[in-house]
Amino acid sequence: MTVPDTYKKKCSSFSAKIILGCLLACFFLLLNGSITCKAETKTYTNKSTGYQVIVEDDANLLTDEEETALGKEMAPITTYGSVAFKSIDYNPYYSTEDYIRSYYRDTFGSTSATVFLVDMDERNIWIHSNGTIYETITKSYANTITDNVYKYASDGDYYTCAFTAFDQIN
């Protein structure tokens, strides 16, 4: 029995489409698996000082409204330096302190700034400051602030935790 040529052409065209479709589906599945989502970074720059407010909630601990309100609470600090709230759910470093020092260096270099970090991977909160702000927010005072607000983080109230920390930094 012989198969007509038109049938062969239809089958080979159909097979090619199926193979192409499967390859595209596999490509997009692989691509989708390699993409990591990062929370939207909210920033504000003080026009008179050039210092910034940065809110990076990578662990998605805050609502959009809480991020906005937190940024407003942080804004007065830009008189003395930049200020950041950072939350993470994965810490590739040995400790929370190592992570925050690296983040500070990458984000602010050696300029005056303070960072409040919520490290969900290590279950830790940390404040790191440098420059002019360090004259007020010393390591000792940063430890006092984190001691004061730790109870809010323990209760899962990360907004109040961060808001109160920045209120004490102000």
Model segments located where?
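A structural boundary signal for the start of the first folded domain, especially the loop/turn
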Residues: 2-170
